[in-house]
């Protein structure tokens, strides 16, 4: 328990979580984290006449759960399109956000490496009354991350993409939102009391951590974060930009018109994907 709670605090500090003790939820992977938000938050807040907004850069884990929920709840799904160089086309963002309750957004595409303007989109989403669910799987391992500066309401990422073990994911969420959400899974560990006529869920974050936790994986994630912090995330980012620039330049010189590189042309506008 002590090791897991130390890891929770460490993860929280790494991403700038205001209240790590209650806002960091451990899952088995980022896919489960995003499903948790879709089912627990979306299930309680979305219905006929509502809408959510996704982008055409999203990983399936930030698309399919919303499709599954849409089949049950009957809300609308809208899409932010792409420009020719695989950036988000925000031309019609005000119209797309009208009446939207949630925005699903990747911080960095897992296909093209495109970095998205998270803070800009989040500010517009909040002005429209929507919460923002961030897929940070590619972002957290490669850039210094501060969820407060990004302004998002939920962020999901996984251990195996940041030098940690498989089988461990993270969901960060604003305490007030997590507190209002029903449990995602039921069983041991997530209950405060069980009687013949019902149960009372545990407090945060245990409410969302049913069953035996991934203890070894959580400790491994802690060690991975310590290592990344030792390297320095700004140094990691500089090195990756240099490698990306070298790769793009060398491939273009050698292959010329035979090669098409999808995504932003400048290395600073993309991750090392």
Tell me the role of every PLM-derived stretch.
Residues 1-273:
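Pyridoxal 5′-phosphate
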